[in-house]
Amino acid sequence: MFREYKMYKFFEQVKQETYKVFWPNRKELIASTLVVVAAVFIFSLICLVLDYSIHNIMQLLLTIGK
C-alpha cells in the first residue's frame, strides 16, 4: 500500500513538473532544430577531414618504411 502511494505521488509530481516546463513554440523549435542539424553537419565534416588526413599520413608513414 505504501509503495503504491509513493508511486502515485511520484507520478503526480511528474505531472506537476510538466506544467512548469517551458515548451518552445513552432518557430523556436524549427530554429533550434536547424542550429543542431547545422552543428552536426559541420562537426561531421571536421571529423571526415581529420579521419582522411590521419589515414593519408599513416599510409605515407607505412610506405616510407618499405
Curated annotation (Swiss-Prot):
Family: Belongs to the SecE/SEC61-gamma family.
A Pfam family per the record: SecE
Record bears the keyword Protein biosynthesis: no
Main location: membrane
InterPro entries assigned to the protein according to its UniProt record, in alphabetical order: SecE_bac, SecE_sf, Translocase_SecE/Sec61-g
Protein name as catalogued: Protein translocase subunit SecE
GO molecular function: protein transmembrane transporter activity
UniProt KW keywords: Cell inner membrane, Cell membrane, Membrane, Protein transport, Translocation, Transmembrane, Transmembrane helix, Transport
GO BP term, pick one: intracellular protein transmembrane transport
Cellular component GO terms held in the UniProt record: plasma membrane
Complexes and interactors: Component of the Sec protein translocase complex. Heterotrimer consisting of SecY, SecE and SecG subunits. The heterotrimers can form oligomers, although 1 heterotrimer is thought to be able to translocate proteins. Interacts with the ribosome. Interacts with SecDF, and other proteins may be involved. Interacts with SecA.
Membrane topology field: Single-pass membrane protein
Membrane-spanning residues: 29-49
Job of this protein: Essential subunit of the Sec protein translocation channel SecYEG. Clamps together the 2 halves of SecY. May contact the channel plug during translocation.
Compartments in which it is found: Cell inner membrane
PANTHER family xrefs: PROTEIN TRANSLOCASE SUBUNIT SECE (PTHR33910:SF1)
